[in-house]
């Protein structure tokens, strides 16, 4: 039978308890109406009914309920994820947090579970606490571990939650933080990938018209061909040298942040559509202007070091002295070259 434990965190709700269960089957109430557990907690619909749980979020390799299983009124969400550092959990966090929040707002008790109830589900619940209580990753995780001492997410999930914090507890797909994260996830699978995801590439600025807002374009200094927009630049903090992958670091020093990069002699950008043919199937090479073939910079999926010392992985590097920065004024349709 399911054993539901009620933690002492200011909640007066009394959770029902039944006969003792294995550790993996425990469902611990970590916040009012929010439970955290393992696979045994969803072994049968009767267990959930006894605990008053009517919403289940499964973060595992397989869904908790086959099609048509469960019981009437049960809401469920399945997020496919392995308990490995390289698993992309970050991209699913907004959907998970929204599911938990919506269910609780409807007065439902929610169970978040994975297989053992110590890593994947812990990461999701930590993200929910971070967002709803505006806590740092460290504070939210520490609080959860006081309630469920065996909670121990893998280092990859820890890194992803730090990125989640850096983005303000919301996954902004247009932010430099997320773009660099997405590139790193592709790098982990490269060069085995047969095709690069289309969404990995920024739109070629020559294929879209100027928007309603002022914009900054970067053009080939030799032939004036538009190459990329300001939004494609992945700003970074100053560094002191190469470190393997960001999730192996202890802090947020690897997170790309907007800052003063006056000493940097290159722009590190997200790949743009005109680069696609040059990137596929090779680990490194030159980046040439698609119009005049002038050398603009280089790329390396394993990373390159900026002149400021920061190691960027992967790296799509454009030398500043090979491009001009041009501000476009849409109202006048004019362009002004910056000095």
From Swiss-Prot:
<dbReference type="GO" id="GO:0004722">
    <property type="term" value="F:protein serine/threonine phosphatase activity"/>
</dbReference>
<dbReference type="InterPro" id="IPR020422">
    <property type="entry name" value="TYR_PHOSPHATASE_DUAL_dom"/>
</dbReference>
<keyword id="KW-0597">Phosphoprotein</keyword>
<dbReference type="GO" id="GO:0008270">
    <property type="term" value="F:zinc ion binding"/>
</dbReference>
<dbReference type="GO" id="GO:0016791">
    <property type="term" value="F:phosphatase activity"/>
</dbReference>
<dbReference type="InterPro" id="IPR000340">
    <property type="entry name" value="Dual-sp_phosphatase_cat-dom"/>
</dbReference>
<dbReference type="GO" id="GO:0004725">
    <property type="term" value="F:protein tyrosine phosphatase activity"/>
</dbReference>
<dbReference type="InterPro" id="IPR029021">
    <property type="entry name" value="Prot-tyrosine_phosphatase-like"/>
</dbReference>
<feature type="active site" description="Phosphocysteine intermediate">
    <location>
        <position position="114"/>
    </location>
</feature>
<dbReference type="InterPro" id="IPR000387">
    <property type="entry name" value="Tyr_Pase_dom"/>
</dbReference>
<dbReference type="Pfam" id="PF00782">
    <property type="entry name" value="DSPc"/>
</dbReference>
<feature type="binding site">
    <location>
        <begin position="115"/>
        <end position="120"/>
    </location>
    <ligand>
        <name>substrate</name>
    </ligand>
</feature>
<keyword id="KW-0479">Metal-binding</keyword>
<dbReference type="InterPro" id="IPR016278">
    <property type="entry name" value="DUSP12"/>
</dbReference>
<comment type="similarity">
    <text>Belongs to the protein-tyrosine phosphatase family. Non-receptor class dual specificity subfamily.</text>
</comment>
<dbReference type="GO" id="GO:0005829">
    <property type="term" value="C:cytosol"/>
</dbReference>
<keyword id="KW-0539">Nucleus</keyword>
<keyword id="KW-0862">Zinc</keyword>
<feature type="modified residue" description="Phosphoserine">
    <location>
        <position position="334"/>
    </location>
</feature>
<keyword id="KW-0378">Hydrolase</keyword>
<feature type="region of interest" description="Disordered">
    <location>
        <begin position="1"/>
        <end position="25"/>
    </location>
</feature>
<keyword id="KW-0904">Protein phosphatase</keyword>
<feature type="domain" description="Tyrosine-protein phosphatase">
    <location>
        <begin position="26"/>
        <end position="170"/>
    </location>
</feature>
<dbReference type="GO" id="GO:0005654">
    <property type="term" value="C:nucleoplasm"/>
</dbReference>
<dbReference type="GO" id="GO:0019900">
    <property type="term" value="F:kinase binding"/>
</dbReference>
<keyword id="KW-0963">Cytoplasm</keyword>
<feature type="compositionally biased region" description="Polar residues">
    <location>
        <begin position="1"/>
        <end position="22"/>
    </location>
</feature>
<keyword id="KW-0007">Acetylation</keyword>
<comment type="function">
    <text>Dual specificity phosphatase; can dephosphorylate both phosphotyrosine and phosphoserine or phosphothreonine residues. Can dephosphorylate glucokinase (in vitro). Has phosphatase activity with the synthetic substrate 6,8-difluoro-4-methylumbelliferyl phosphate and other in vitro substrates.</text>
</comment>
<feature type="modified residue" description="N-acetylmethionine">
    <location>
        <position position="1"/>
    </location>
</feature>
<dbReference type="GO" id="GO:0008138">
    <property type="term" value="F:protein tyrosine/serine/threonine phosphatase activity"/>
</dbReference>
<protein>
    <recommendedName>
        <fullName>Dual specificity protein phosphatase 12</fullName>
        <ecNumber>3.1.3.16</ecNumber>
        <ecNumber>3.1.3.48</ecNumber>
    </recommendedName>
</protein>
<dbReference type="GO" id="GO:0004721">
    <property type="term" value="F:phosphoprotein phosphatase activity"/>
</dbReference>
<dbReference type="GO" id="GO:0005737">
    <property type="term" value="C:cytoplasm"/>
</dbReference>
<comment type="subunit">
    <text>Monomer.</text>
</comment>
<dbReference type="GO" id="GO:0005634">
    <property type="term" value="C:nucleus"/>
</dbReference>
